[in-house]
Design a protein with these regions (language model features):
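C-terminal soluble interaction/assembly domains
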Residues: 215-216, 221-225, 236
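A short pocket-lining beta-strand/turn micro-motif at the edge of beta-sheets
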Residues: 188, 200-204, 226-230, 240-246, ...
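Residues on the lipid-exposed face of transmembrane beta-strands in outer-membrane beta-barrel proteins
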Residues: 1-5, 48-52, 97-101, 138-142, ...
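Flexible, surface-exposed loop regions and adjacent strand-edge segments
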Residues: 31-37, 76-83, 135-136, 159-160, ...
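Gram-negative/organellar outer-membrane beta-barrel architecture
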Residues: 1-91, 184, 243-247, 251-268
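C-terminal outer-membrane beta-barrel translocator/porin domains of Gram-negative envelope proteins
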Residues: 84-88, 92-217
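Outer-membrane beta-barrel strand-turn architecture
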Residues: 6-11, 52-56, 103-105, 110, ...
Length: 268
């Protein structure tokens, strides 16, 4: 369940999320080890963020998150691998600060403007979690209109950790890869997407991106820690007034990594 509301002439923004599920994954190359691993997991997430516009287009705010993720192998070998690398899941509760810059012309389907978001989450046992560690994120996006309703954009995403257990490491933020299959202390990705409008409601998008895991034994200077992907798909405008869209995309990563995505909203 996702909720987003603005009030006070958009001086206040409140975002909340609650979700959970049972997840099955079959990895042909788990964490780049060449070993196939089958996992099963239970997860729930509660998160909330409040932003206050201090001066257009700047926002300051706070956020909190409560996650519970339990992962276990579907067979003895998978379970032993997960135990050895410490990927068994845990409860984590944290809070942090947010600084955001938002000059986009629309929240759902921007066609121009710039978006920047820097935030941290301090996970602490004193808040009810099982580990003390920190996560820092920086996201930048810029939109350029062209043609008749088409939009070109780029996006830079970063996630850094400090003292995080393996279950709290960063995963690839790149279409075409399964979340959690490749992990590192830190992650940075850069993506470019062109959304080509074909009519009042229909259009298609093409995209490409690169990501890197680094920190510890991983480095962006090592080719094995750099990941590429590309793809494309169709989009349909469900509500023209609100610029709500549905998308169907295919992304191809390295090796056997690929994915088909159907969602409400944009993938980037």
């Amino acid at each position: 369940m996702f909720a987003r509301t603005y009030f006070g002439e958009d001086r206040h923004r409140l975002i909340a999320f609650a979700g959970g599920g049972h997840v099955y994954n079959n990895y042909e190359d788990f964490l780049g080890s060449g070993v196939p691993v089958s996992t099963e997991g239970n997860a729930h997430v509660l998160a909330a963020r409040y932003l206050y516009r201090v001066r257009a287009p700047w926002f300051l705010g706070v956020q909190a998150v409560d996650t519970n993720y339990l992962i276990f192998g579907e067979n003895a070998l998978s379970g032993e691998i997960l135990e050895r690398i410490g990927l068994t899941g845990f409860d984590s509760v944290g809070a942090g600060l947010v600084v955001s810059y938002d000059s986009r012309d629309d929240q759902n389907s921007p066609s121009s403007g710039f978006f920047g978001d820097a935030n941290n989450v301090a996970y602490r046992e004193s808040l009810g979690g099982e580990a003390d560690f920190d996560v820092y994120r920086l996201t930048l996006k810029q939109y350029f209109p062209h043609g008749r309703g088409s939009v070109l954009l780029w996006a830079l995403s970063n996630r850094w950790t400090r003292d995080a257990p393996p279950a709290g490491y960063s995963t690839l933020n790149l279409r075409g890869y399964v979340g959690g299959q490749y992990l590192g202390e830190n992650m940075s990705s850069f993506q470019v997407e062109d959304r080509i409008r074909m009519g009042p409601r229909w259009g298609f998008a093409v995209f490409a991106g690169v990501a890197c895991l680094y920190g510890g034994r991983e480095s962006c200077g090592n080719a094995k820690d750099v990941y590429w992907s590309g793809g494309g798909g169709l989009y349909y405008v469900l509500k023209q007034r609100d610029k709500m869209v549905a998308t169907l995309e295919y992304a191809d990563g390295e090796g056997a990594n690929r994915g088909l995505y159907m969602r409400f909203g944009w993938g980037l």
